[in-house]
Amino acid sequence: MPGTSVSDLSTATAVDAPALLPLPVARPSAPAVVRGKLYIKTHGCQMNEYDSAKMADVLAASEGLELTDNPEEADVVLVNTCSIREKAQEKVFSQLGRWKALKAGGKPVIIGVGGCVASQEGEAIVKRAPYVDLVFGPQTLHRLPELIRARRESGKSQVDISFPEIEKFDRLPEPRAEGPSAFVSIMEGCSKYCSFCVVPYTRGEEVSRPFEDVLVEVAQLAAQGVREINLLGQNVNAYRGAYGADAGDAAQYADLGLLIRTIAQIEGIGRIRFTTSHPLEFSDSLVDAYRDVPQLANYLHLPVQAGSDRILSAMKRGYTALEFKSRIRKLRAVRPDISISSDFIVGFPGETEADFEKTMKLIEDVGFDQSFSFVYSRRPGTPASDLQDDTPETVKQARLARLQAHISAHAASISQSMVGSVQRVLVEGPSRRDPNELTGKSENMRPVNFPGNPRLIGQFVDVLITEAMSNSLRGRIQLDDSAH
């Protein structure tokens, strides 16, 4: 179906889609006057990458701060933290200790801590590292200009780790495209409270952005040349975006499937991805979107965590291994060749060898293409942190190595099977491996390197895969006029 322009969206409809308000065409804004330098160190997930980009946008617009990759020349240095992995707090304080020297000689450098560790630790960060000027959570990054001004005027450290729901999205500047692919956050937080996870405590309960607000951001990015949209959320397929007169009591709600259908009609958007999902929220509506929307990438990341029902219950995941496989079967009925990746936690408290073998059986049955897998890391304040854990670390590491080796071997076989096929690739830029070549990603998230004209950057091209490498593919453009 032909693309829908921004101005046409007031009348565009998807299957069961609401009538939408006219969306503004993005116009280039005047560049801010540069009044200083900003350095941001980002740890963790894609949500943090998105948040860091928004911090940069906010401070460029309000304070005239320009990004630098050298903290020593920065006027403001920020670390955007992640609390998922073990010893996250200690890593943050180690980073801060290295930055303390930036204030030597009385240089008025602002040092700030954001992200999930900031939410967890709050005032404790300033007590332990009194040279820290700002502590702010994921929901208050939009208040950075006010926090910086308050710090400079009062001379006191500022801490704001509140949860003002979706307010931050209302106070962010217009998005700026940094390439042909862009992330768009559509919701915040998680309400699942898995026993091992800190996210509900650091990012709050699930809150969805209004439906039309998301479409406005996507349309603005498309007008700037973005061709691939990555929809983000801690539990992205729980999205319920309000739309209607005032998005109030009488509002209706769009789920992720409807959002995808509608985004697919925006002119210029040629590919849609989303992450991260929860199996409990993997609805028939989403399966139908995979069936009906060709722009929806032939790839799904769906964290299962374990294959043992006993361990899944202890994790409070809310589904069984059989129920997970049932969802995959439904999806493969409409997308038989879809690539599926997942998350695994090995060595969860009480995991026996039999439990682990059930995880390996699930991996064999599903045929995962990629995985993000780790040994269980105890997170203070979570229910699982109180569980007895008597499995030796050497056993856990051996299990993890076996799991990763199995999935890596299967992924290699998939890559090899792609040799001789034609893959649709979004050209992202010059290859890091060889600047004379171009690089992009296939639908199943494999880097593809190939010779080509730099003018193709930002376009989709059909690439004939000629070789499978350990972590990438090589190929050549199938036709000279294949860009579209």
UniProtKB/Swiss-Prot annotation:
Cofactor(s) named in the record: [4Fe-4S] cluster
Location, primary (coarse class): cytoplasm
Residues of the MTTase N-terminal domain: 36-153
Documented EC number(s): 2.8.4.3
Cofactor annotation remark: Binds 2 [4Fe-4S] clusters. One cluster is coordinated with 3 cysteines and an exchangeable S-adenosyl-L-methionine.
Swiss-Prot/TrEMBL keywords: 4Fe-4S, Cytoplasm, Iron, Iron-sulfur, Metal-binding, S-adenosyl-L-methionine, Transferase, tRNA processing
One cellular-component annotation, GO: cytosol
A GO MF term: metal ion binding
UniProt function note: Catalyzes the methylthiolation of N6-(dimethylallyl)adenosine (i(6)A), leading to the formation of 2-methylthio-N6-(dimethylallyl)adenosine (ms(2)i(6)A) at position 37 in tRNAs that read codons beginning with uridine.
Quaternary structure and interacting proteins, as annotated: Monomer.
PANTHER family reported in the protein's UniProt record: CDK5 REGULATORY SUBUNIT-ASSOCIATED PROTEIN 1, MITOCHONDRIAL TRNA METHYLTHIOTRANSFERASE CDK5RAP1
Protein name: tRNA-2-methylthio-N(6)-dimethylallyladenosine synthase
Gene label: miaB
